[in-house]
Curated annotation (Swiss-Prot):
Enzyme Commission number(s) of this protein: 6.1.1.5
Protein name: Isoleucine--tRNA ligase
InterPro entries linked to this entry: aa-tRNA-synth_I_CS (IPR001412), aa-tRNA-synth_Ia (IPR002300), Anticodon_Ile_BEm (IPR033708), Ile-tRNA-ligase (IPR002301), Ile-tRNA-ligase_type1 (IPR023585), Ile-tRNA_ligase (IPR050081), M/V/L/I-tRNA-synth_anticd-bd (IPR013155), Rossmann-like_a/b/a_fold (IPR014729)
Ranges spanned by the short sequence motif 'HIGH' region, renumbered to the chain: 57-67
Source species taxonomy: Bacteria, Bacillati, Bacillota, Bacilli, Lactobacillales
Bound cofactor: record note: Binds 1 zinc ion per subunit.
Native source organism of the sequence: Streptococcus mutans serotype c (strain ATCC 700610 / UA159)
The organism's place on the tree of life at top rank: Bacteria
Protein encoded by which gene: ileS
PANTHER family in UniProt: ISOLEUCINE--TRNA LIGASE, MITOCHONDRIAL, SOLEUCYL-TRNA SYNTHETASE
Pfam families: Anticodon_1, tRNA-synt_1, zf-FPG_IleRS
Protein biosynthesis in keyword set: yes
Amino acid sequence: MKLKETLNLGKTAFPMRAGLPNKEPQWQKQWDEANIYAKRQELNANKPAFFLHDGPPYANGNIHVGHALNKISKDIIIRSKSMSGFRAPYIPGWDTHGLPIEQVLAKKGVKRKEIDLADYLDMCRQYALSQVDKQRQDFKRLGVSGDWENPYITLVPKYEAAQIRVFGAMADKGYIYHGAKPVYWSWSSESALAEAEIEYHDIDSTSLYYANRVKDGKDILDTDTYIVVWTTTPFTITASRGLTVGPDIDYVVVKPANDERKFLVAQALLSELAERFAWDNPQVLATHKGIELDRIVTIHPWDDNVEELVMNGDHVTLDSGTGIVHTAPGFGEDDYNVGVKYGLDVVVTVNERGIMMENAGPDFEGQFYDKVLPTVKEKLGDLLLASEVITHSYPFDWRTKKPIIWRAVPQWFASVSKFRQDILDEIDKVHFYPAWGKTRLYNMIRDRGDWVISRQRAWGVPLPIFYAEDGTAIMTKEVTDHIANLFEEHGSVIWWQREAKDLLPEGFTHPGSPNGEFTKENDIMDVWFDSGSSWNGVLNTREDLGYPADLYLEGSDQYRGWFNSSLITSVAVNGHAPYKSVLSQGFVLDGKGEKMSKSKGNIISPNDVAKQYGAEILRLWVASVDTDSDVRVSMEILGQVSETYRKIRNTLRFLIANTTDFNPYINKIAFEDLRSVDKYMLIKFNQLVSVINRAYSHYDFMTIYKAVVNFVTVDLSAFYLDFAKDVVYIEAADDLARRQMQTVFYEILVNITKLLTPILPHTSEEIWSYLEHEEEAFVQLAEMPEAQEFANQDEILDTWSAFMSLRDQAQKALEEARNAKIIGKSLEAHLTVYASEEVKTLLTALDSNIAQLLIVSQLTVTQEQAPKNALVFEDVAFSVEHARGHVCDRCRRIDETVKERPYHVTICNHCAAIVENHFPEAVRQGFESK
């Protein structure tokens, strides 16, 4: 027979090469056929519930890597909770209304105003559902488990009805009102926008310094005085109706030597402004507090028929400009607020498409608002003192990527101010990951204005508001409940298919309509009201869910989006937050830390990653990054993650291969009967179990990743498995030491597979298929291991921790010997340990084959004084010489007993004894020659 046939060389069909791109879809098909998600829910039916509510992605296009980060993170949490004693259903959702879908149809040549509205809305609906199907397949390809056949979709009639009921409850409490306040207006979308629908970019703008002449100085200023104003939006001068000063700011009247006019500016800015305007030796004639200037009257710079009132406002600062700002109540929130206080007219001179209207004056009418600068300069004439280009942050429509303006238009609002404190109180009760999220959301709610909820579009949920003949808005509970029931039965499209009187409850009357005539609102709801109602449309209506949710998890942009809108509607209707905890994640950037974009060519597609590396690599990447801040990804980074995956896989493959002849019901050794080193490894592993379980409960995936990688590479590969072959390969199959080590192998293999399942479900399932003694058909149906406590574990850990330090010192001695050409491999070494009493006691306490642990052929422990050439440490020294004897062909150790026998001359006595006791045919026939 061959010598290697006497070895227990681990064999397994578990492949080294994962082949993930091909294997993952096969596993996913098995899971679908076996209905694993439903079985897990059945197993946990009577367990405590955990509800992670899915924030709905927008149904348009394939998923991007940000979607992957989000959905994989949720999947890791749901899987870990499901395996840890919780009923944790996952209902994926989609946001399906809104402008992007209208834009897609427009690009396809669909002209909304030229076809029947019901037909147009059906086209929107069909497109949205096609995108839901596309994204559903993308998410399933990532291994995300959930009730994919029963998702929630915001265009479904039952969901739309739930949304109307939220609106109705808010209206019933007086939180819905109509007003003409300035709102973010997107001329490119022809619609109002919510705060969550804007993004900021740095742009260059031309700012102007100009002057208004005083008409009535109220005995404070002379009529030959000019008040100097600064603006960054020249087009709004067409609607300017006042000037605002700071009440506590000091202002000075100055007379430059080179100008006949007198000017008023902020005292603190005089020096800077004099230089900018080239004023020669400006003489200060008077000083006034802003409060003294209240209600002084000035003349509009080019329209003598328009008077502009000087007002006081706390929003005026000395950061830039002149300390005085012009005020156009139709084009700014601060302008509007101070204008209302002083009774100014709200004038809007720009239409919905950004075109200057007739009331802007004949010189401006028909021009695009952003192109009027030359006309403004011409109209200002010698009242224009200076202009300069500045770079500043400016709001853009997040969908069209075009700049927006503030514009006062009649809109429907949801009040926040009426119950703001209630919202803030609820935020204090929510747990945030990371903790700074609480402050961020708190400040956003504290500082935000009321919510403009109306949109001038078609594809969305109609505002269920009627108007009486006298213009009175009707949104009583009776009416909104009736509309909700109609929507639930027919869908919201019925709003457009029926006349107002046919939508109202039968026999409905109103004192404002003596003739029984009614009209209906044509605006739709902000899509953030759609998704912000999901706590009612999903959590509150599905039998398998509950409200409030345990967790909302989304990107950090959702503090002004879904976290925000959901909180407002939930507190408005029910008085409490829709979530107990909020977890936010940073954005996904490319490998250089730059934003991904098609133009840069740096987009990483999850589908491409799945094809090249497999979804497991993307999932492992998610676990490896700190999502509290922005994260980076590139194919190079994923390649590094793939290498880490390979190390984990091959380490676990070694454990599989070396437990194929191990039956835990027959061969398992009790803890108290294990060798000390085996006890140590089990204790170390259970520390890992504890760390991982705690990290899962805190959604701390990176800690899990680091802990697993460290255990696999340091504790297993670099130590325990490094000397394991000397036991599991060399000793007899049923040798006690081998069974002891296999006990540890198997315990680690089974439980680390369970621990990794939430992150690497495909790989874990593949490993599980080789564990024939485990009762669950799929590892996803197993339970997470719980950390065990062992007798004397602290003492064992202390002892082995001391040995690991000694081992590091010994390896330095072996490395020096290797560099000096005394040895090649460590098995060629005879290591002498010059031990102090403390070290000798330690080595005795280990009760182990120290030479085997250090992977040397021969070891001597002595308390003699170390020679001069020894490597000396504080309480121990080492010397290394080449081992004496010959290499054993079987165990590869150098041993002086090799060649001592008349037969089996190439192996040592220890190996010979094993062969003679277990392979009698080798004794009779000898070994085949190499």
